[in-house]
Amino acid sequence: MKMTGWKKKLCRGHHLWALGCYMLLAVVALRLSLRLKCDVDSLDLESRDFQSQRCRDILYKNLKLPAKRSINCSGITRGDQEAVVQALLDNLEVKKKRLPFTDTYYLNITRDCERFKAQRKFIQFPLSKEELDFPIAYSMVVHEKIENFERLLRAVYAPQNIYCVHVDVKSPETFKEAVKAIISCFPNVFMASKLVPVVYASWSRVQADLNCMEDLLQSSVPWKYLLNTCGTDFPIKTNAEMVLALKMLNGKNSMESEIPSEYKKNRWKYRYEVTDRLYLTSKMKDPPPDNLPMFTGNAYFVASRAFVQHVLENPKSQRLIEWVKDTYSPDEHLWATLQRAPWMPGSVPYHPKYHISDMTAIARLVKWQDHEGDVSMGAPYAPCSGIHQRAICIYGAGDLYWILQNHHLLANKFDPRVDDNVLQCLEEYLRHKAIYGTEL
């Protein structure tokens, strides 16, 4: 009799335990279904649930980037000087500096792609119908600092876009393998089919972009515009904001294109030869082909698909390309000159009224050291709050408010080893704005 009672208690205990487990699983399933409902509904892009605050909150909670430092990013993005000073002081504390992720880290974590994408918080579905219907192409030229590349890719990534990655042939093998491992996790990210050794200020920097252009035109993705990036770039607009800006171009391109100074004219007066670096020769060059006037700009462009097609297929474009191959830093005058060529789609006339400065174009926001100064006295921007490299500002936290006031799509230069706080706050700002459509 005692045994029977014990068995009944045991069975009752098992029953209650099983019921408790069932209820717990039901709650978990309900929460999971709500989460999946928000995600799945957002995929069809017509869901009112996705527009709801609740679903946005769930989405943001799952996609919010983990803060590495306890700094006031909301204050920094709004230009609060106390928050900026605290971030700059925080950045000076060596003990708080985090070592960047290594090639080995990415080789290991990408063995499980789903875990990698979830842990690193990649957005894996379009956030709006407008974005889905307007895919963007990227040519990404990199050679070092694997974490910089992964964070840049994460910041510009959207599944409807297409990304070509060119890795310098001279890069260490472990870096190349880490890049391959990262891009293997995404169906719309690929390595350029032809890789070249990139030498500073030489033709090879242009060739890297041309190789990606060829590959991107072969893609089945109907991209509308091409943006090119390097490893020290970072977006300052969300993908939705980029789509809006590109639509407003209405087929035009956007890149710096100005009359060259006498100093810059010397870049194509004599031929240059390349070994491990660029060497000036005494051989004078012939004038540019087709009596084309030369213009100068920078390496970055926002180019329509039709412009890219004409770069690769138009005989006049090809003649100019051949002519600039032995000049100094051809990326800084090839695109600028093609932007003024009358046969190029989306170009603008030679006339001085159409000169475009780097501040007017939307391609890239850069602080040049020799232009920094007192804005109240006419300087275009205040001094860099980070450090300078080749007379270009590597941004600090004190630059972020100014950066976000500009209309450019991307900015240069960022380096987490110089100031990771500015990148952390920019990442947080962009992710919040992508989900909620509002600033921090």
Swiss-Prot record:
Alphabetized UniProt keyword annotations: Disulfide bond, Glycoprotein, Glycosyltransferase, Golgi apparatus, Membrane, Signal-anchor, Transferase, Transmembrane, Transmembrane helix
GO-annotated biological processes: protein glycosylation
Positions glycosylated per UniProt: N108
Segments on the Lumenal face: 31-440
Gene Ontology cellular component terms for the protein in this record: Golgi membrane
Subcellular location: Golgi apparatus membrane
Membrane-related topology note: Single-pass type II membrane protein
Keyword Ligase: no
Single GO MF annotation: N-acetyllactosaminide beta-1,6-N-acetylglucosaminyltransferase activity
Primary localization class, coarse: Golgi
Name used for this protein in its record: Beta-1,3-galactosyl-O-glycosyl-glycoprotein beta-1,6-N-acetylglucosaminyltransferase 3
